[in-house]
A protein has these predicted regions:
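Membrane-embedded alpha-helical bundles that constitute the cytochrome b-like, heme-associated redox core
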Residues: 2-257
Length: 257
């Protein structure tokens, strides 16, 4: 029974007797699976559910940088891996029209959205607020205005685009990976293992969402004061937890640092 199962897992998806693929295309597939199939789901989970960490005394302790540093650093790593993966496929096959087939179309859309995410993050505007995000020291009130703290139009557009593109990227990633595995006639253990990983990530997502861990970014950073610009408007996105507001001023928050 075990031997038969192992044989089935090692057999290509089509049932062919062997699996052969050109080396550049093999590395293209491996790197795209690593970047988009394995690394991207936990990065989204960290960004969505760990703006406040489990041991953090929130809202007394605000602006935990863990989620942002992790999301930004690993997001750039994912972008670099995708770039190398695309270099391999161009070296192996040369240029093909994005409309060549479903996999090619989905793959180029994934690359485009990765670029949108990276470029958008560079253009998101200034931070603002009563505490300098780099030195962690209080700032005078004259320096508080910023795109994020003041929720300017620039910041609002960024949030809609960044979050919307992120979830669209997930859908297209599933399509690109599935069609890529079929096109490569990959051994069956690959879609089985990748599917198990995504099911586990989906279970973690649902569990954290039901636990109320998707805390509003603005409140996670600047607290519950009802007078703050971001607390006077609805959060952008779905399933976001907005805690009851309290009368703690941003000046008091800055003085606690």
């Amino acid at each position: 029974m075990i031997a038969e199962l192992l044989h089935w897992l090692a057999t290509p998806i089509s049932g062919a007797s062997d699996h052969a693929i050109a080396m550049p295309l093999a590395w293209h597939g491996r790197l795209m699976v690593l970047a988009m199939g394995l690394l991207t789901p936990p990065l989204i989970i960290v960004a969505r559910f760990f703006k406040v960490t489990p041991q953090q005394d929130w809202p007394r302790q605000l602006d935990n940088p863990f989620w942002f540093i992790t999301h930004r650093r690993w997001g750039h790593i994912v972008g670099a891996i995708v770039a190398v993966a695309m270099a391999f496929v161009l070296a192996g096959r040369g240029w093909e029209s994005p409309l060549h087939n479903v996999h090619t179309a989905a793959g180029w859309l994934v690359v485009l959205l990765v670029l949108v995410q990276l470029i958008g993050s560079w253009l998101r505007g200034t931070h603002g607020g009563p505490v300098d995000p780099f030195t962690r020291k209080p700032r005078p009130a004259a320096l508080w205005p910023g795109d994020h703290y003041s929720m300017t139009r620039r910041r609002i557009i960024f949030e809609y685009m960044h979050k919307g593109a992120g979830y669209l990227l997930l859908v297209l990633t599933v399509l690109a990976l599935c069609t890529g595995l079929i096109a490569a006639d990959a051994p069956r253990w690959m879609p089985v293992a990748l599917g198990a990983w995504w099911i586990m990530m989906a279970a973690v997502f649902v569990s954290l969402q039901r636990a109320g861990r998707c805390i509003d970014t603005y409140q996670a950073i600047w607290g519950l004061n009802p007078d703050l610009p971001g607390n006077r408007r609805r959060p952008i996105g779905f399933g976001i937890v907005r805690r009851p507001i309290t009368n703690v001023s941003p000046r008091e928050r800055a003085s606690e640092k």
